[in-house]
Amino acid sequence: MKMKCFAKNALAVTTLMIAACGMANASTVINSKDVSGEVTVKQGNTFHVDFAPNTGEIFAGKQPGDVTMFTLTMGDTAPHGGWRLIPTGDSKGGYMISADGDYVGLYSYMMSWVGIDNNWYINDDSPKDIKDHLYVKAGTVLKPTTYKFTGRVEEYVF
């Protein structure tokens, strides 16, 4: 008699476990197919950067006023948060270098300098072009030689 009671309890426990684990309502798969796909996200086609030397004449000697050495135009109609100009190579630190190896500091009219990050930046999400100038300050002495600046322009988002 005790065996009958145990068997009934075991059957009840098993039924409860199957129902709780979802086995009582398990479905039978009759068809299946694996799927995959790729999608390409393109950069806005209006991203552009133009970096050019001053086209006017610059004379050697002590400069009587601020003198633009390079112009930088950058823009993108795609959403963005801002721009940074990172001096590279010998220009690291924000310098142009002469053919003789002399370093001359450059400044930006529109962008702020962050020395610890070695870059100028501007937080500007406008779709309009930004036209900036890298210049030497009044009083800077320039030699009659060729000066070079190297850098990388980055567009960023937040």
Curated annotation (Swiss-Prot):
GO CC annotations?
A: pilus
Write the lineage as a comma-separated list: Bacteria, Pseudomonadati, Pseudomonadota, Gammaproteobacteria, Enterobacterales
The record's CDD domains line, in alphabetical order, gives: PsaA_MyfA (cd18777)
The species is Yersinia pestis
Q: What induces it?
A: Expressed inside macrophages under acidic pH and at 37 degrees Celsius.
Superkingdom in the source lineage: Bacteria
Under the subunit heading, UniProt states: Forms a homomer composed of subunits assembled in a large structure.
Q: Does the keyword Signal apply?
A: yes
Name of the molecule in the record: pH 6 antigen
Recite the UniProt keywords alphabetically. Fimbrium, Signal, Virulence
Q: Which gene encodes it?
A: psaA
